[in-house]
From Swiss-Prot:
The keyword Transcription does not apply. GO terms for molecular function: adenyl-nucleotide exchange factor activity. Transmembrane segments: none annotated. Belongs to the SIL1 family. It comes from Debaryomyces hansenii (strain ATCC 36239 / CBS 767 / BCRC 21394 / JCM 1990 / NBRC 0083 / IGC 2968) (Yeast). This is Nucleotide exchange factor SIL1. Keywords: Endoplasmic reticulum, Protein transport, Signal, Translocation, Transport. GO terms for biological process: protein transport.
Length: 427
């Protein structure tokens, strides 16, 4: 029995597209609405079919899709990979009936179960064929030569050759297969980290971090490779770099890498566990005020995807959702964490309050919520009377912080004229 490749493709698509769509399309996902037409809404995550569809502004593209540029209208389009369009290999697949005897009418007869089993076997073989690398030899040579250049680069080496190699890897790292190849060998990512440390040119550093982020984005296999093949210093270096005077474009790339790593629940359990006293959330909170707008947006996207921005009341949620300003989202997050006892220690309390004061001092348009001001009034009174429970003994640093909190209540969040009366009452 012969099954044409078109027929088999139909069977494959019937069996395979549904699970693909169920994992790609999330009915609870975020929607994007056109600013000039609020009724024109579409999923933030692109929902593919077997037909070419235009990728709308702001949509995220899941990994594993065919993407092209429509030369007629210059719009980007994407669709699910269709096995029937594969041009390599035979145009048909053979399914041979088992011949147990030479009986004329029955020699080629198969039960429905036998036919189904054999078709499933052919489907399995077909999927294995589809899973093989589609990377051309030329691309692979370019990939390997570029990787070799990065791995053999030493401080003071040929920057032009390095830049060319990085450009090649930037182009290839967007492909899911090349992303996996880049991460399978632990020495490749380690070499990229070494290059980022050894070169002074920020353009070259930015290229390195862009390669890392592109190879990990929407690529869980690549993320798994990195988490298995790299040690903790890889992550530590990323967070350390955020807390330097590096350019904002580099910090944005690093946040993209961290964001990609949060696809993995094991990574989140270790680094973003709310019960962890050294949670990486605090590192992100600490650097936020020093970032520029695009990096601030990317940082808040990380917190949002980690589901850390919930807990506000309905009015606050509406305000957060309607605000495109990351500073406003950041402020709401810190206000809620402080007022609703969402901090784990006195040190975390100080960090959150100081950073909230800093961002409100930077942007006078930010306004505290009524609930936060009511909490702050009680907190300031409690601390001014020395009735606040501490993690340890009351120190001079604690006393200074309590005074700063009282001042911030009026100067930063309230009426500065009220500070004089508050200080007089305290005396």
């Amino acid at each position: 029995m012969k099954l044409s490749k078109g027929v088999l493709s139909s069977i494959l698509l019937t069996l395979l597209i549904k699970p693909i769509e169920s994992s790609i399309v999330n009915t609870d996902g975020e929607l994007i609405c056109a600013p000039n037409n609020p009724t024109d809404c579409y999923p933030k995550i692109f929902e593919p079919t077997t037909e070419w569809q235009t990728i709308r502004e702001g949509q995220d593209i899941p990994a594993g899709l065919h993407v092209r540029l429509n030369m007629e209208n210059l719009a980007r389009e994407a669709k699910i990979l269709d096995p029937s369009e594969e041009t390599e290999g035979s145009s048909e697949l053979m399914v041979n009936a088992e011949q147990n005897n030479d009986n004329g009418d029955n020699s080629h007869q198969m039960t429905n179960e036998d036919q189904a089993n054999e078709i499933q076997q052919k489907i399995k073989e077909f999927k294995q064929t589809q899973g093989k690398s589609k990377v051309s030899t030329v691309d692979l040579n370019d990939f390997q030569s570029s990787v070799d250049e990065v791995q053999h680069y030493r401080e003071g080496g040929d920057a032009n050759r390095l830049s060319t190699a990085l450009d090649t890897l930037i182009d290839l790292s967007h492909d899911i297969e090349f992303g996996v190849k880049l991460t399978q060998d632990s020495s490749v990512f380690r070499s990229l980290v070494d290059v980022s440390k050894s070169v002074q040119d920020e353009d070259l550093q930015e290229k390195v971090y862009r390669i890392m982020g592109s190879s990990l984005r929407n690529n869980p296999d690549a993320v798994n490779h990195v988490l298995k093949n790299q040690d903790a210093t890889f992550v530590e270096c990323l967070f350390d770099k955020l807390d330097t005077d590096a350019s904002d474009v580099i910090k944005k790339r690093i946040l993209g890498i961290i964001h990609a790593l949060t696809q993995n629940s094991h990574f989140n359990a270790k680094y973003f566990n709310s019960n962890n006293a050294n949670s990486a959330v605090d590192s992100l909170i600490s650097v936020f005020p020093s970032l520029e707008s695009q990096s601030q947006t990317r940082l808040m996207n990380i917190l949002e995807d980690l589901k850390l921005l919930g807990g506000a009341n309905s009015n606050e949620k509406r305000a957060i959702e309607e605000s495109a300003d990351p500073k406003s989202q950041y402020s709401h997050f810190l206000q809620h964490s402080l007022a609703d006892s969402g901090v784990a220690s006195e040190d975390q309390f100080k960090l959150y309050f100081n950073k909230l004061s800093e961002v409100h001092s930077q942007d006078k348009s930010l306004k505290p919520s009524k609930a936060f001001m009511e909490w702050l009034s009680k907190e300031a009174e409690l601390r001014s009377k020395g009735n606040k429970e501490r993690d340890s003994s009351y120190t001079e640093e604690d006393r200074q912080f309590d005074q700063d909190l009282l001042r911030a209540r009026h100067v930063v969040f309230g009426n500065p004229m009220g500070l004089r009366k508050a200080l007089a009452d305290e005396l």
